[in-house]
Amino acid sequence: MKNWFLICSALVLFWACNAQDPISRDYRCWFLFSSTDHPTSILITTIQSPGSYVRVTTHGDGKTTPRHVLVRSNDPSVADEDNIIRSAIENELRYELGASNDIGLIIGCTNFDGPRAYDAACPNCSVLKALNWTGNRQQVICSRCNRTYLLDTGNIISGEEGESLRRYNCTFDGTTIRAWN
């Protein structure tokens, strides 16, 4: 009986360890954005609005050149936003936005599962290719492989089979947005 229990326990642990983690570890992701320092940012509004998403990129290192967090909405009527990072805390951080800081992250709020962050680079193209907004604001498309992804799930909804979007942990505590893996 004791051996049977040990075998069952080992199998449960084996299956638990093999469960697929939805969080991508392909590229490092670390992003932090505070509403205290940027209270009017569309990023703060977006993270609280189900079905809304933005693309976030960063430029500058915060030491030799000023750091900027650039935000582009999935709503074409909303102007792009350039947030200059001035606080010492934010400038000390090393922002890593997945596959490429120039391509960035897609951050938003799903309709059913709260805050979400995805890599904005197509996971199915061997060359880093930025995803583009479609006419439907909750979808992105790769102009190279023509796959369309649904941002609520990260899954392909049109085009050849392949990998889902690279997803990162994302939280908003009412003050700070964090994306990481």
Where do the protein language model's features map onto the residues?
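Sec-dependent signal peptide recognition
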Residues: K2-C8
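C-terminal motif of bacterial Sec signal peptides marking the signal peptidase cleavage site
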Residues: L13-A16
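N-terminal pre-ligand scaffold of iron-sulfur
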Residues: D21-T134, Y168-N181
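Short solvent-exposed loop/turn micro-motifs enriched in small/polar/acidic residues
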Residues: S100, C142, E161-L165
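Acidic, glycine-rich flexible loop segments
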Residues: R116-G159
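Short Fe-S-cluster ligation motifs
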Residues: R147-N181
